[in-house]
Amino acid sequence: MSNVGIIGGADGPTAIFVTSALPRMLNPWGMAIILLMMIPNVIFALRHRNMENRCKSRFINILEQIGRYGCFILMIICIGLDKFGFGSVEDFLIYLFGSALLLLAYFIFWILYGRSPSRKKALALAIIPCCLFLLCGVTLRQWPLVVFSMLFCVGHICVTLS
């Protein structure tokens, strides 16, 4: 197993970067994104243990969960590819910096929401992960991740608005 990943197309490698010693179908960046996203969610869940889901639609709740867990799995495991990788340096940079900016926005909105909860902030906290999953799916050309991100988006926003 190699610790070097190559970004490039049919005309040859465009760039070489060091990756983890994980199997090539695992996405170490996706693992980090999921772990970072979960930090404020776990803190919130521990502080609000008795909070109930106000969405009474079983269909919407199931749709959200299918989308959520599909995104979590596909952010970490690249299905349908023989290895994890990007089509170009640009894809990698968009993925890296776009994800970083969306995570930063997510953390900022969690801080703002923690200080004074509001519907608008809750909606931002629902939309940002959807955008993050969609960005990752498109830049990695992981079309199943794009599909699951859309399912999650519809379900998560509906649950948040209820």
PLM feature spans:
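Alpha-helical membrane segments and immediately flanking helix-loop junctions
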Residues: 1-21
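Structural signature of hydrophobic alpha-helical transmembrane segments
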Residues: 2-3, 29-34, 89-100, 120-124
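N-terminal signal-anchor transmembrane alpha helix
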Residues: 23-43
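Membrane-helix exit/interface motif
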Residues: 74-85, 105-113, 136
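Juxtamembrane boundary at the C-terminal end of a transmembrane helix
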Residues: 157-162
